[in-house]
């Protein structure tokens, strides 16, 4: 009776005369109790992604002011009962979070959700003028797009600029 709900990653709006700088407050993932479908109840917020130590911005929410690439939840691994080759764990959520990379969460306690691990691909080695979105300011950032997890624990991640990664959980994220 629980449902994971995302707000698609928001983006700053850029126009020929400049950008509109606006808050991106809704880049969240939520746990919602839907045991009564007429009264869904928010029971938890997923942890907001932390930036790595060497990240050039104080948080992911403001990075769009100086570089290309949105931030926010984009795609979740969605196991389906009729697909036995996909991981069917109910205690994990995998989310491609655009510029924040792939995030893996432990939802075994739906009221206290913990981030277990993350993967951030390297930034693409391309010039801003080679962008899919010409005219946007700053360097390009890696953006994870979609993810899927098979029954062996392999995580398949697509990225906007540089292709496809096959990852394997290890350590605490594998438990």
Over which residues does each language-model region extend?
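Feature marking well-ordered beta-strand scaffolds used for ligand recognition
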Residues: 1-175
């Amino acid at each position: 009776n629980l449902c994971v709900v995302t707000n698609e990653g928001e983006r700053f709006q850029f126009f020929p005369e400049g950008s509109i700088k606006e808050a991106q407050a809704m880049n969240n993932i939520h746990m919602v109790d839907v045991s009564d479908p007429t009264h869904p109840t928010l029971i938890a917020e997923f942890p907001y992604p932390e930036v790595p130590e060497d990240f050039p911005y104080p948080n992911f929410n403001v990075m769009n002011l100086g570089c290309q690439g949105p931030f926010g939840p984009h795609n979740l691994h969605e196991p389906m009962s009729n697909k036995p080759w996909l991981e069917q764990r109910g205690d994990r959520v995998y989310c491609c979070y655009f510029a924040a990379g792939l995030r893996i969460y432990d939802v075994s306690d739906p009221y206290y959700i913990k981030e277990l691990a993350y993967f951030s691909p390297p930034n693409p080695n391309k010039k801003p003028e080679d962008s899919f979105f010409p005219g946007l300011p700053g360097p390009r950032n890696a953006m994870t797009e979609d993810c899927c997890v098979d029954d062996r624990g392999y995580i398949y991640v697509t990225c906007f600029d540089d292709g496809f990664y096959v990852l394997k959980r290890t350590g605490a994220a594998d438990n």
